[in-house]
């Protein structure tokens, strides 16, 4: 049995941002795909194209933004095997698990809230269980986006694999903008600053207009072989 490291690391420069989700258009707007949504917005904002990389079992891109090299990954393994793709990138580039930021949905938070942490358990999220198992560590930062609990008699699986309702879209848009800003804050000012700034905020109300600051067009580097 793999021993899992649980001690929060000293803050390490982020090298890879991973969004968890399921591939395919049928899952594109589901609650379980919040991580994919954030990585897609980062890729567009930074000018980093994503393309399927078989060696990584995922959609991957790299380039320069915010003064440094940035790597983005969306595992194409389906949620429960996400860790295979993350491990493949870490092994290829010889990255420390503590340099990975994983973005994913969380039913324990209501829609409109997000939560940054430097380490922690999977909290019942199967994608994170896979990442922790393959990295052999819980000691890596993560950004959780709230999707709330099922309503009425709906089960958990049906809830996370269900699409956001039209009435939820405005809140989701604000949360995604805030998540992009939180990732950029992590990169520029560090995880602790980002936690203090974003964890207390509630984006469920109409007065929340937080969004990332304007960014100069990113310079994209050619892919490494």
From Swiss-Prot:
This protein's major location comes to: cytoplasm
Q: Where is the active site?
A: 32 (proton acceptor)
- Which InterPro entries does the protein's record reference? Pept_tRNA_hydro, Pept_tRNA_hydro_CS, Pept_tRNA_hydro_sf
Q: Which residues bind tRNA?
A: 27, 78, 80, 126
Q: Does the record carry ATP-binding as a key word?
A: no
Q: Which UniProt keywords are listed?
A: Cytoplasm, Hydrolase, RNA-binding, tRNA-binding
- What positions are marked as the site Discriminates between blocked and unblocked aminoacyl-tRNA? 22
Localization per record: Cytoplasm
What's a BP term from Gene Ontology annotated to this protein?
rescue of stalled ribosome
Q: Which cellular component terms (GO) are annotated to the entry?
A: cytoplasm
> Looking at the record, which segments are called Disordered?
198-225
Q: Which CDD domains match?
A: PTH
Q: Name one GO molecular function term.
A: tRNA binding
**Site (Stabilizes the basic form of H active site to accept a proton): which residue positions?**
105
Catalytic activity, as annotated? an N-acyl-L-alpha-aminoacyl-tRNA + H2O = an N-acyl-L-amino acid + a tRNA + H(+)
> Per the UniProt record, which EC number(s) apply here?
3.1.1.29
Per UniProt, subunit arrangement is: Monomer.
Q: What does this protein do?
A: Hydrolyzes ribosome-free peptidyl-tRNAs (with 1 or more amino acids incorporated), which drop off the ribosome during protein synthesis, or as a result of ribosome stalling. Catalyzes the release of premature peptidyl moieties from peptidyl-tRNA molecules trapped in stalled 50S ribosomal subunits, and thus maintains levels of free tRNAs and 50S ribosomes.
Similarity section: Belongs to the PTH family.
| Listed name of the protein | Peptidyl-tRNA hydrolase
What gene name is listed for this protein?
pth
């Amino acid at each position: 049995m793999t021993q899992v490291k649980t001690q929060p690391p000293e803050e390490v420069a982020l090298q890879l941002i991973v969004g968890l989700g399921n591939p395919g258009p049928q899952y594109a707007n589901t609650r379980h795909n919040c991580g994919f949504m954030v990585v897609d917005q980062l890729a567009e904002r930074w000018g980093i194209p994503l393309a399927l990389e078989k060696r990584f079992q995922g959609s991957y891109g790299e380039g320069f933004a915010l003064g440094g090299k940035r790597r983005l990954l969306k595992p194409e393994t389906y949620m429960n095997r996400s860790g295979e793709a993350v491990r493949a990138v870490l092994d290829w580039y010889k990255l420390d698990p503590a340099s990975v930021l994983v973005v994913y949905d969380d039913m324990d938070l209501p829609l409109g809230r997000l939560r940054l942490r430097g380490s922690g358990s999977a909290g019942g999220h199967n994608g994170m269980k896979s990442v922790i198992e393959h990295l052999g560590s819980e000691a890596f930062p993560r950004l959780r986006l709230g999707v709330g609990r099922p309503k009425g008699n709906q089960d958990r699986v049906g809830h996370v694999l269900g699409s956001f309702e039209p009435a939820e879209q405005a809140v989701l848009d604000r949360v995604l903008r805030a998540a992009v800003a939180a990732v950029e804050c992590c990169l520029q000012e560090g995880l602790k600053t980002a936690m203090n700034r974003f964890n207390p905020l509630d984006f469920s109300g109409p007065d929340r207009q937080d969004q990332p600051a304007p960014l100069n067009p990113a310079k994209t580097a050619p892919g490494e072989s």
